[in-house]
């Protein structure tokens, strides 16, 4: 390890965004970069990280997960657990490996406020393409990247339950799409996953480890940052605790990449946030930015589970007696049930005709099991994960004290608006309608969860309150926006904290609003784009491409109803 005490850039957090920055910023050989990760290393021999199907094991395990929990959610009457990666790669080392860009119209929404124009889809698309190596796309696909560090597997969704689910979508009046990250997101089809040759493709494995051979990159794990140092409003360095000792390093710039929980926490501890709130915690305000920790978004989801009449599901793979054989197949050949995350297909649909683009995402699984490993009591089963994708419920994060080791108070306010409740009722009814189509008849052995007793709107909402889980997509807690927006925290042109010098934010907290899918891909894109901004490089040229828009494009544009891909 380097013993230098001064760096051009100190990156707080070796997660998704921090891994991208650690790689891109060290492409400038004259810049010294230090990445500080509070968790441990993502060892290549660690099966719970590297084996795709082991994704359920790290959550709730203190060796992999910081194990956050919300306060009692006021509209659910209970606390909600939140897993956050406690290893190099952050949550990309323990997540579900699902790669979803979000809808192009998400980014058009980002760009609506004055000053945010450079974050529209045309400006973001080239950065998505720069990070991707899309094995499921043709070399001439103008929407997808082909040479990036993130290797993406398409589907394959060959289990017959996937085909029946896709066909059920068509019977219910929807369309199939070959690539939900391409021209047409809306519809049913295979998903991309960050799995290559049977192994997880985390941000650290794709970006950070290849860069570690560079002499100008230093990565320190188990390094918990406790303080950012300032000279007036200029960040000058950080203090971190490692192996029981405190260390201080100087920094030309400090970049916060701690994620949607830790970035606003460190900002508040540094005196950046709502001035009155900070004073109440005994912290002298440095910069009054009331948006720090506010505008907090997340996706809530439920599982609709069915018994499967035919022995085609993956339910038997959950049998403890089979696990040694499944593990051996993976260890020696990187094949078998352990070589996939099994989120190989799903859908994006609109729950009503008033929304402009899909507000529901379905993850379909040919197995009935909860994220924590609790399996349904059936020999064979399948399930669909569903939830609203752009709810208008907003939460907040607030520190409890000046102690950097004390976890902050978190409330997402799930189900806090009438619109949110209505979308939830629509989500369950849409999902049930699809799962009741004739295409599912050969397999449909009846609904296990929530079960036939849950029918009315209020019964549905009661079940969601009891059973809903986070989809693990926290974002927007230090959002980008123009200085004219009193709730914005980060300058979208520089990624600097408003009013501060040499202090930037690059992670999910900077998203101005969440996207309509899993957020790992948008975070990688944001970090790629931010790296060029920080380096002072000319940004990649915007790419203005046509994409499917409901009510504007032909209804069948981009649909793949008879594509041979689906003829398993």
UniProtKB/Swiss-Prot annotation:
Catalytic activity reported: choline + A = betaine aldehyde + AH2; betaine aldehyde + NAD(+) + H2O = glycine betaine + NADH + 2 H(+)
GO cellular component term of the entry, any: membrane
Keyword field: FAD, Flavoprotein, NAD, Oxidoreductase
Cofactor: FAD
Gene3D superfamilies, A to Z: 3.30.410.40, FAD/NAD(P)-binding domain
Transmembrane feature ranges: none
Keyword Manganese: no
Function noted in UniProt: Involved in the biosynthesis of the osmoprotectant glycine betaine. Catalyzes the oxidation of choline to betaine aldehyde and betaine aldehyde to glycine betaine at the same rate.
GO biological process, one term: glycine betaine biosynthetic process from choline
Highest taxon listed in the record's lineage: Bacteria
Positions that bind FAD: 8-37
Pfam families in the cross-refs: GMC_oxred_C, GMC_oxred_N
Keyword Flavoprotein: yes
InterPro entries membership: BetA, FAD/NAD-bd_sf, GMC_OxRdtase, GMC_OxRdtase_N, GMC_OxRtase_C
Pathway entry: Amine and polyamine biosynthesis; betaine biosynthesis via choline pathway; betaine aldehyde from choline (cytochrome c reductase route): step 1/1
Active-site residues, record numbering mapped to chain: 473 (proton acceptor)
PROSITE patterns: GMC_OXRED_1, GMC_OXRED_2
Protein family according to the UniProt entry: Belongs to the GMC oxidoreductase family.
MF GO annotations: betaine-aldehyde dehydrogenase (NAD+) activity; choline dehydrogenase activity; flavin adenine dinucleotide binding
EC number: 1.1.99.1, 1.2.1.8
Listed name of the protein: Oxygen-dependent choline dehydrogenase
């Amino acid at each position: 390890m380097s013993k230098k005490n001064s760096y051009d850039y100190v990156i707080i957090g070796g997660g998704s965004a921090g891994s991208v920055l650690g790689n891109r910023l060290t492409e400038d050989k004259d810049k010294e970069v230090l990445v500080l990760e509070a968790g441990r290393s993502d060892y290549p021999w660690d099966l719970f990280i590297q084996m795709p199907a082991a994704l359920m094991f790290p959550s709730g395990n203190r060796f992999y997960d910081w194990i956050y929990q919300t306060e009692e959610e006021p509209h659910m009457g209970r606390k909600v657990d939140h897993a956050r990666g406690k290893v190099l790669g952050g949550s990309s080392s323990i997540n579900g490996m699902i790669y979803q860009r979000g809808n192009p119209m998400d980014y058009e929404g980002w760009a609506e406020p004055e000053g945010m124009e450079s974050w529209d889809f045309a400006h973001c698309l080239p950065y998505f393409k720069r990070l991707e190596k899309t094995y499921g796309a043709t070399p001439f696909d103008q929407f997808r990247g082909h040479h990036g560090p993130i290797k993406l597997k398409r589907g394959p969704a060959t289990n017959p339950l996937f085909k029946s689910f896709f066909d059920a979508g068509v019977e219910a009046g929807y369309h199939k799409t070959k690539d939900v990250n391409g021209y047409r997101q809306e519809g049913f089809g295979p998903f991309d996953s960050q799995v290559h040759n049977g192994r997880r493709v985390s941000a650290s494995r794709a970006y950070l480890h290849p860069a570690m051979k560079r002499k100008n990159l230093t990565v320190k794990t188990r390094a918990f940052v406790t303080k950012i140092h300032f000279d007036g409003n200029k960040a000058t360095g950080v203090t971190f605790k490692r192996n029981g000792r405190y260390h201080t390093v100087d920094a030309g710039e400090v970049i916060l990449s701690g994620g949607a929980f830790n970035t606003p926490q460190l900002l508040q501890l540094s005196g950046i946030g709502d001035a009155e709130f900070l004073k109440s915690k005994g912290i002298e305000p440095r910069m009054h930015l009331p948006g720090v920790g506010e505008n907090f978004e997340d996706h809530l989801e439920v599982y609709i589970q069915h018994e499967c009449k035919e022995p085609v599901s993956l339910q038997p793979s959950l049998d403890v007696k089979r696990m040694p054989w499944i593990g051996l197949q993976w260890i020696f050949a990187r094949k078998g049930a352990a070589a996939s995350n099994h989120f190989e297909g799903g859908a994006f649909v609109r729950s009503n005709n008033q929304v402009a683009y899909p507000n529901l995402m379905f993850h379909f699984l040919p197995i009935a099991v909860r994220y924590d490993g609790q399996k349904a009591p059936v020999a064979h089963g399948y399930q669909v994960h569903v939830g609203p994708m752009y709810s208008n419920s907003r939460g907040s994060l607030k520190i409890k004290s000046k102690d950097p080791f004390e976890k902050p108070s978190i409330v997402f306010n799930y189900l806090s608006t009438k619109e949110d409740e209505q979308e939830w009722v629509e989500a369950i009814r849409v999902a049930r309608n699809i799962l009741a189509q004739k295409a599912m008849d050969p397999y449909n052995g009846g609904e296990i969860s929530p079960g036939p007793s849950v029918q009315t709107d209020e019964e549905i909402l009661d079940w969601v309150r009891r059973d809903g889980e986070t989809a693990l997509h926290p974002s927007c807690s230090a959002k980008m926006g123009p200085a004219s927006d009193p709730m914005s925290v980060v300058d979208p042109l520089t990624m600097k904290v408003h009013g501060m010098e040499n202090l930037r934010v690059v992670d999910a907290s900077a998203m101005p609003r969440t996207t309509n899918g899993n957020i790992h891909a948008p975070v990688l894109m944001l970090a790629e784009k931010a790296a060029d901004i920080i380096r002072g490089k000319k940004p990649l040229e915007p790419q203005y491409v046509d994409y499917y828009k409901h009510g504007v494009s032909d209804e069948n544009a981009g649909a793949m109803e008879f594509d041979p891909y689906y003829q398993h």
